[in-house]
C-alpha cells in the first residue's frame, strides 16, 4: 500500500518509522522548514526522510493547486498526518482511496485543537492519550480508528509527558497499521457532546496569576517547563521564569504574590504556597530557588507579579465608524475591557453607547460620515486600526433605496479605504455573508466559493455587489499598494441591541427583531415564502471575540485574509427560529404583559419586500480560516442567544404604558 505522509516533530519521526515498519511504501513526505525563532529540541523529519532515501518537501502552502496536482500524481492509497501543523484541504484528503488519517495527541473528542499536551497539564488532568482518526474538513472531528491511554503522573512535566505520548503513539501505530494495510479500518464516530476545543498557546500565556489556587499555578509551571518557554512572573520590572516547583499547603495567611520565605523560596497563592525549586532571572542561567531569590533581591514580604510599567507605551488606537451600531457598540465594550486599547468613534446617534460616554479611553463625536470627512481623515491618520462599520444592511432597504445603499455602502466607504491607503493604516473591513449570494456550495469558503448574484433587474443584490466590489478594491490595494487589511464576513449575528423595535415597526430590521415585534404587539408572525430559508445564527459574543482577535492580529496571521465569522452548528430555518422564539416567549416571566400569540402567516416575498427581491435558500459558512488564523471556535448555542435577545427587547418595552 502506497502512502503519502505529512509529518513534523518527534511524533512525525515516530509515525514515519512506524509506517515503514508496517510494510507500507512511502511515496513522499511533506514537512515544515524549521523556524529559527523556535526551540527545535525535537527530531527532524526532513533529516530522517533524507537518510531513508524518501523524497521530502516543505512547501509554504501544501494546499496550493500545484502541490495538490503533484500529490495526485503520486497516486497514494492512503494518507497519514503525524503532527503536521497545517490543515489539509478537502482536495488532498480525497486523493487517497483508503482515506486520510491523523495522529492527535489527546483522547478525542476531548482536547481537539492545538497544544493538547500543554493544555492537559494546565488543567491538571490525570490521563490523556493519543488518537488516530480519519481526517475530515473539520479539524480533529473525524471517526476514531484507534486510541491509547496515557497516565499523567503528578511529577510529569511537558517534556516527560511528551516522551510518554511518543512511546504510546509508536505502540498504537505498531498495532493498528498492519490491520489498516489489510483494508480493515475501524471507525467509531466521535461523541460531539463530549468534544472540547483548545486554541494555540503563546509564550505570554505563561504569566503567573498568584491569585489563582496553588495547584493551578503549579500546573502552569509543569505545562510550559523547558524546553517550552516557561511560566514567569515579575519582581518590579525584572522578569523571572520558574522551571520547577512544588505545592506547599500553608500560605501562612500571606497575600497572594507575597514572598513567604527565600530559603526555600516560597510564594503565597490563593490557597497555599508555591515553592520554587529552580528558576531563571531574565536571560540568565537556571539556578535553585534560594539563589534565584538572592539574584532578584527578594526578601520575605516582597510582592511579586508586578509587570513592568507601561506608561511609556502608547495604547493602540482603534477608529470605529458606526460605533453606535450593533457590532460597533459590542466591540467597543470588548476593547475597553483591555487596558491597551483606546477607542475613537463616530455615529449619528449614541443611545447604544451611552454607557461608555464617560469612559476615559472612549472618545465619541456625533456625526455623519457623508459630511464629516475632515474629522474622519484626521482620525484615520491618528489611529492604528480602522473599522468602517457604517452600512445599510437590512434587506427591505435594498429594494426601497438601492441608490442610497450604493452611495453609503460603497462610495462613502471607498473614501475611507483610500484614507487608509494614503496614511498606511490597517483596515478591518466588514464584508458580508451576502456576497456569496446564491452560491450552491454546501458551506461557503472565503477563498474558493463562487459569488453568485441574480440579474440586474433584481435590486435586492445592490448590497451584495457593493460589498463585493469594495472587497475586490481593498484586495487590489493590498496587492498593489501594500494596504494592510482583513475582511470579515459575519453570518447572522444576533444578541442584545440588535436593531430596535421602532426600526422593526417600519420594516427596517433584521429577522429576529421583526419576529419579536410581532410577539410584543400580538400581530401574526410573517413567514416570508414559508420561512424555509436556512441561516446559521451566531451569538454576538462569539462574533465579537473573533473580531477582537482579528484586531489583535497575533503574529500578523490575519493580514490579507478573508475570514467568515459564523456558527455552522446553529443552522436553522426562519420558521424554526420563529418557533424557538415563540417557545422562549411563552416561558418568559414577562409573558403575561403581552397579547396572545396571533399565529403564523405565510406571505410572498414580493408582497413584503417589493418588486426586485430574491431570497437565498441557505447560507452556511466554512470557518476553517477563523480556526486557523484566530484559534477561534463558536461555543454559544442558538437557544441561549435567542433567549437573551428576547429578554433584552421585552425588558425594553414600557410595560406600564402598555398596560394603560
Curated annotation (Swiss-Prot):
Residues annotated as binding UDP-alpha-D-glucuronate: 393, 398, 432-433, 460, 492, 526-535, 613
Site, as annotated: Transition state stabilizer: 102
Entry binding sites for NAD(+): 347, 368-369
Metabolic or biological pathway, per its Swiss-Prot or TrEMBL entry: Nucleotide-sugar biosynthesis; UDP-4-deoxy-4-formamido-beta-L-arabinose biosynthesis; UDP-4-deoxy-4-formamido-beta-L-arabinose from UDP-alpha-D-glucuronate: step 1/3; Nucleotide-sugar biosynthesis; UDP-4-deoxy-4-formamido-beta-L-arabinose biosynthesis; UDP-4-deoxy-4-formamido-beta-L-arabinose from UDP-alpha-D-glucuronate: step 3/3; Bacterial outer membrane biogenesis; lipopolysaccharide biosynthesis
Cysteine pairings via disulfide bonds: none
Ranges that cross the membrane: none
UniProt-listed GO biological process terms: lipid A biosynthetic process; lipopolysaccharide biosynthetic process; response to antibiotic
Chain residue ranges for the region called Dehydrogenase ArnADH: 314-660
Entry superkingdom: Bacteria
Gene Ontology cellular-component annotations: membrane
UniProt-annotated stretches for the region Formyltransferase ArnAFT: 1-304
Residues the record lists as binding (6R)-10-formyltetrahydrofolate: 114, 136-140
Catalysed reactions, semicolon-separated: UDP-alpha-D-glucuronate + NAD(+) = UDP-beta-L-threo-pentopyranos-4-ulose + CO2 + NADH; UDP-4-amino-4-deoxy-beta-L-arabinose + (6R)-10-formyltetrahydrofolate = UDP-4-deoxy-4-formamido-beta-L-arabinose + (6S)-5,6,7,8-tetrahydrofolate + H(+)
MF annotations from Gene Ontology: carboxy-lyase activity; UDP-4-amino-4-deoxy-L-arabinose formyltransferase activity; UDP-glucuronate dehydrogenase activity
Residues of the site described as Raises pKa of active site His: 140
UniProt keyword terms in alphabetical order: Antibiotic resistance, Lipid A biosynthesis, Lipid biosynthesis, Lipid metabolism, Lipopolysaccharide biosynthesis, Multifunctional enzyme, NAD, Oxidoreductase, Transferase
Family annotation (InterPro entries): Arna-like_SDR_e, Bifun_polymyxin_resist_ArnA, Epimerase_deHydtase, Formyl_trans_C, Formyl_transf_N, Formyl_transf_N_sf, Formyl_transferase-like_C_sf, Lipid_A_modif_metabolic_enz
Reported function: Bifunctional enzyme that catalyzes the oxidative decarboxylation of UDP-glucuronic acid (UDP-GlcUA) to UDP-4-keto-arabinose (UDP-Ara4O) and the addition of a formyl group to UDP-4-amino-4-deoxy-L-arabinose (UDP-L-Ara4N) to form UDP-L-4-formamido-arabinose (UDP-L-Ara4FN). The modified arabinose is attached to lipid A and is required for resistance to polymyxin and cationic antimicrobial peptides.
Family listed: In the N-terminal section; belongs to the Fmt family. UDP-L-Ara4N formyltransferase subfamily.
Protein name: Bifunctional polymyxin resistance protein ArnA
Lineage, highest ranks first: Bacteria, Pseudomonadati, Pseudomonadota, Gammaproteobacteria, Enterobacterales
Name of encoding gene: arnA
